[in-house]
């Protein structure tokens, strides 16, 4: 079994950007109700607040000050803080992998602007934090949200030590002709129009590219707006997300000693997050509960 951390603060559920993060509290509660926090290898860590200095590694002070004026300031701090805490504990070897449950999005956040329920770039902020404090250089980000991760791409476009694989709405066909290769480390691929095509596309593109790139850690943005009852492609069922977790965890185990952080804001209805959340934790922690 693996040691798995779940990073979450109650504010991320109660103050979630609710039109986007529809099932945050229910997703976390389902993990608890299924008994995972009674297992010796699964632990809940309350997400701390990130500091302005930590956020300032990627975002301008002007943008930080703008976010302060919004009602999403505190939930954004805890969302980023959970990611930083998970990054620290995984890279220090205190846990093997982690699930970070945020109350806001992140991948549409640029240095000094954002849109789409995003304020700070939650996953991306883990990378300069790891580089500054944990002597880690090389990362892969896999994004299976329905929308293009324009903020992540913008922040790391010139950084060849970050592999960014995005399965995004801009190229949503089930054909190779939709692929867009911006560079050897920045690429977009189509997401699927069903569980089967989504799994096929991720299996086709992710493992081999990550094995070739050899990151020291993998981040996976598990966007659930691809769910058939959410606001995105409305293509997938809740059964797809644990299967994606298995694929991405498998390559992390092979390439970087299992160092994997899954970030989600559970942007799907509660019935979907209640199903997917505990099964993703089961996959990460290798408990075999649903085998």
Q: What function would you assign to each model-found segment?
A:
Residues 3, 57-291:
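A general "terminal functional-core" signal
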């Amino acid at each position: 079994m693996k040691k798995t951390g779940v990073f979450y603060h109650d504010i991320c559920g109660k103050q979630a950007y609710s039109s986007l993060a529809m099932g945050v509290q229910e997703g976390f509660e389902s993990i608890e109700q299924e008994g995972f926090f009674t297992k010796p290898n699964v632990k809940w860590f309350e997400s701390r607040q990130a500091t302005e200095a930590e956020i300032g590694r990627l975002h301008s002070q002007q943008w930080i000050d703008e976010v302060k004026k919004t009602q999403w300031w505190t939930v954004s701090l805890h969302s980023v803080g959970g990611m930083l805490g998970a990054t620290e504990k995984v890279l220090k070897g205190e846990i093997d992998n982690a699930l970070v449950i945020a109350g806001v999005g992140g991948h549409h956040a640029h240095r000094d602007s954002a849109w789409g329920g995003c304020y700070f770039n939650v996953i991306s902020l883990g990378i300069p934090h790891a580089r500054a404090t944990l002597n880690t250089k090389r990362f892969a980000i896999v994004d299976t949200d329905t929308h293009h991760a324009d903020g992540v791409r913008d922040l790391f476009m010139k950084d060849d030590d970050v592999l960014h694989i995005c399965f995004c709405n801009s190229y949503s066909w089930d054909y190779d002709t939709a692929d867009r290769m911006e560079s050897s480390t920045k690429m977009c691929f189509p997401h699927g129009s069903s569980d089967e095509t989504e799994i096929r596309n991720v299996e086709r593109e992710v493992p081999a590219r990550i094995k070739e790139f050899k990151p020291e850690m993998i981040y996976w943005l598990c966007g659930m707006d691809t769910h058939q009852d959410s606001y995105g492609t409305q293509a997938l069922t809740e059964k797809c997300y644990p299967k994606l977790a298995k694929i991405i965890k498998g390559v992390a185990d092979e390439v970087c000693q299992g160092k994997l952080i899954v970030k989600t804001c559970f942007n799907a209805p509660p019935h979907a997050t209640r199903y997917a959340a505990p099964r993703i934790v089961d996959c990460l922690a290798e408990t075999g509960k649903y085998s």
